């Protein structure tokens, strides 16, 4: 993982703030951000999920480019532990997408869509749509993944997100 002197702070409705701890400067931008994640192989590349899709910055957060999934709210992001070009995005409605090219293109992993009982997932506040709130990938066995569904429980994949089962 690349080391960086930058601290990312995402505040929903306020934007992404990139604080440079060496230069003691702050860069702000990209409002409506829900989640932000630094690239593990480059201290200047950041990814952000918003209520209007997936964004990427390659210049330390100064500029952002929309990189797809614009019809979804992005609630969670996770990087493959040994392949920094592979990124997972959890959305509202509760779907899971994967990019194998550093966030340039995205493919839905439809195993989440096929889970029985999915129609009962419901977020308790309007608009009552469940979303994938968290994604965790086992650091030594990236075939093993977990997603938390708000509200719907925790699901597990043993094949890098292709199929899923409930664990709670």
Task: Set out the residue ranges of the language-model regions.
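Extracellular glycan-interacting surfaces
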Residues: 1-168
């Amino acid at each position: 993982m690349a080391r960086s002197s930058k601290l990312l702070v995402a505040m929903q409705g306020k934007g992404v703030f990139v604080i440079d701890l060496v230069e003691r400067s702050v860069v702000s931008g990209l409002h409506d951000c829900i989640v932000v994640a630094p690239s593990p192989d480059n201290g200047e590349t950041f990814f952000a999920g918003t209520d209007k899709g997936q964004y990427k910055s390659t210049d330390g957060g100064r500029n952002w480019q929309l990189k797809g999934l614009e019809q979804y709210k992005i609630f969670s992001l996770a990087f493959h532990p040994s392949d920094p070009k592979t990124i997972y995005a959890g959305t509202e409605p509760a779907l899971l997408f994967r990019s194998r090219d550093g966030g340039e293109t995205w493919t839905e992993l439809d195993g989440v869509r096929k889970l029985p009982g999915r129609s009962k997932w419901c977020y308790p506040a309007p608009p009552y749509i469940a979303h994938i709130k968290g994604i965790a990938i086992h650091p030594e066995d990236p075939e093993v993944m977990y997603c938390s569904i708000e509200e719907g429980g925790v699901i597990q994949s043993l094949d890098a997100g292709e199929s899923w089962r409930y664990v709670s």
